[in-house]
């Protein structure tokens, strides 16, 4: 069947009054793209009939987006899309159309649906990305029109499924050989040779080998060589002074001194000949409750035992010796037992 001859009248307007460009080839083939929805509603057939005086090439949108059909490059002076805006905004479809249209060609989208602000901006953005210019949105008719630039260099299409595109290639800027080698050595995980290893000693300064000394506060009166036990400063705020005062108070009060009567020594002196002093005191325990303790001071001078070696230490004491567990002492020395050794005292 011979296609109808193109006329200027058929090319000057579309079915719903959209004025078309007459600067393109009036005898070229018009590309009409439809969908299943537009075919069922009759919009696809109506768009084809609008160009009855021209040669029309018809395609379904899903065939183009799926890559089943390819379009010839720089062939069509006009493309008419009878699809909805979701299908028309497909980057694959718009890129393919941009490659297939001639310079200064016209693209018309008739979705037969209302165009709101968000939909129009989305379609317009996709058309700009694909490389189209002179984009116009007709809210009353629900149509969008755009043009392909006169020169291919003004397009920055993202590519098409047919493999032919007028998009500008993105070329990687090659650096010099020295910069490439420097970058390669920067990301290298292994040194090129053993000479590249850094001597750790070279990273140290002379001052790093000198032992550091602690910083001393100006009001601290604790000097070096005063013994292992630390003395609290004059203005102590760390609690050391309170701990030392508590230790001193406990050492002076929580002591029980044995009498010779408690020593169970067969040859020990009788109480009449032994000096004995008893002191009863009330102290506050760690649990906050008052406790009554008895301090007994006994002069062990002249005290003897069956073995006579109790003062030498546990190695010379029998199992019933009252001095068992105490350090060695001199004969006649006061024997003191801390309260902490027996909770019942």
Curated annotation (Swiss-Prot):
Residue numbers spanned by region Disordered: 147-166
Cofactor list: [2Fe-2S] cluster; [4Fe-4S] cluster
Low complexity composition-biased segments: 153-166
Sample GO molecular function, one term: 4 iron, 4 sulfur cluster binding
Motif Cx2C motif 1: chain residues: 307-310
An annotated GO cellular component: cytoplasm
Stretches for region N-terminal SAM-like domain: 11-166
Keyword Iron-sulfur: yes
Ranges where the record places region Fe-S binding site B: 307-321
Alphabetically ordered keywords of this record: 2Fe-2S, 4Fe-4S, Cytoplasm, Iron, Iron-sulfur, Metal-binding, Mitochondrion
Pfam families in UniProt: CIAPIN1, DRE2_N
Role played: Component of the cytosolic iron-sulfur (Fe-S) protein assembly (CIA) machinery required for the maturation of extramitochondrial Fe-S proteins. Part of an electron transfer chain functioning in an early step of cytosolic Fe-S biogenesis, facilitating the de novo assembly of a [4Fe-4S] cluster on the scaffold complex CFD1-NBP35. Electrons are transferred to DRE2 from NADPH via the FAD- and FMN-containing protein TAH18.
Assembly and oligomerization: Monomer. Interacts with TAH18. Interacts with MIA40.
HAMAP family named in the record: Anamorsin
Family statement drawn from the similarity comment of this UniProt entry: Belongs to the anamorsin family.
Domains: entry comment: The C-terminal domain binds 2 Fe-S clusters but is otherwise mostly in an intrinsically disordered conformation. The N-terminal domain has structural similarity with S-adenosyl-L-methionine-dependent methyltransferases, but does not bind S-adenosyl-L-methionine. It is required for correct assembly of the 2 Fe-S clusters.
Protein's UniProt name: Fe-S cluster assembly protein DRE2
Gene source species: Mycosarcoma maydis (Corn smut fungus)
């Amino acid at each position: 069947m011979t296609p109808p001859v193109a006329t200027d009248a058929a090319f000057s307007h579309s079915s719903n009054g959209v004025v078309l460009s007459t600067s393109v080839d009036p005898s070229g083939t018009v590309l009409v793209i439809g969908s299943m929805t537009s075919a069922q509603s009759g919009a696809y057939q109506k768009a084809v009939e609008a160009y009855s005086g021209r040669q029309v090439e018809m395609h379904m949108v899903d065939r183009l987006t799926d890559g089943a059909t390819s379009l010839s490059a720089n062939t069509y002076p006009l493309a008419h899309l009878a699809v909805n805006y979701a299908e028309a905004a497909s980057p694959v479809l718009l890129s393919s159309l941009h490659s297939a249209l001639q310079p200064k060609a016209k693209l018309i989208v008739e979705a037969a649906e209302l165009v709101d602000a968000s939909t129009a901006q989305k379609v317009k953005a996709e058309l700009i990305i694909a490389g189209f210019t002179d984009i116009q949105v007709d809210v009353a008719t629900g149509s969008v029109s755009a043009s392909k630039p006169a020169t291919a260099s003004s397009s920055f299409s993202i590519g098409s499924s047919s493999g032919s595109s007028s998009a500008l290639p993105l070329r990687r800027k090659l650096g010099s050989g020295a910069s490439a080698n420097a970058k390669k050595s920067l990301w290298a995980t292994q040194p090129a040779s053993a000479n590249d290893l850094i001597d750790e000693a070279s990273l140290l300064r002379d001052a790093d080998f000198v032992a550091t000394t602690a910083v001393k506060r100006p009001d601290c009166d604790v000097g070096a060589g005063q013994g292992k036990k630390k003395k609290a400063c004059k203005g102590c705020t760390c609690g050391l002074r309170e701990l030392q005062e508590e230790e001193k108070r406990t050492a002076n009060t929580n002591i029980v001194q044995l009498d010779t009567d408690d020593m169970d020594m067969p040859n020990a002196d009788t109480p009449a000949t032994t000096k004995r002093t008893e002191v009863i005191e009330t102290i506050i325990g760690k649990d906050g409750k008052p406790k009554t303790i008895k301090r007994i001071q006994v002069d062990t001078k002249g005290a003897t035992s069956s073995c006579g070696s109790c003062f030498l230490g546990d190695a010379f004491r029998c199992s019933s010796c009252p001095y068992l567990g105490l350090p060695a002492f001199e004969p006649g020395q006061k024997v003191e037992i801390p309260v902490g050794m027996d909770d019942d005292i």
